[in-house]
């Protein structure tokens, strides 16, 4: 796992026990999962808008910024649910080299 993700995961874990007024992340944990999910949704929409703007203008600065926000809030969500970023990286590694169509078909319930 990248050093940045490792360090960020450690900070997110530390903030779970911090006072809500001590950091933004601690305040999110204090507000609960619904607030965290709201932020993930908000950042998803902002990322989509930034992608459309980048496609039209060729300027990807906002796209990178909003994607970082989306990833960050997704990591907060995972942490709130007791999951580590490595679990997502492991899943991506598992999928590497698999046909996307075959992987999706394997998840479909039989009719």
UniProtKB/Swiss-Prot annotation:
Its EC number is 3.6.1.31. It comes from the Bacteria. GO terms for molecular function: ATP binding; phosphoribosyl-ATP diphosphatase activity. It is found in: Cytoplasm. InterPro entries: HisE, PRib-ATP_PPHydrolase-like. One of its GO terms (biological process) is L-histidine biosynthetic process. This is Phosphoribosyl-ATP pyrophosphatase. It comes from Pseudomonas aeruginosa (strain ATCC 15692 / DSM 22644 / CIP 104116 / JCM 14847 / LMG 12228 / 1C / PRS 101 / PAO1). The lineage of its organism: Bacteria, Pseudomonadati, Pseudomonadota, Gammaproteobacteria, Pseudomonadales. The gene is hisE.
């Amino acid at each position: 796992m990248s050093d940045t993700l490792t360090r960020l995961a450690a900070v997110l874990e530390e903030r779970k026990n911090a006072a809500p007024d001590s950091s933004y992340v601690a305040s999110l944990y204090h507000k609960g999962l619904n607030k965290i999910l709201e932020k993930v949704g908000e950042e998803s929409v902002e990322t989509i808008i930034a992608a459309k703007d980048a496609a039209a203008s060729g300027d990807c600065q906002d796209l990178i910024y909003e994607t970082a926000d989306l990833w960050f809030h997704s990591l907060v969500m995972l942490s709130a649910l007791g999951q580590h970023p490595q679990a997502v990286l492991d899943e991506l590694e598992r999928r590497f080299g698999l046909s996307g169509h075959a992987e999706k078909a394997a998840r479909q319930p039989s009719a």
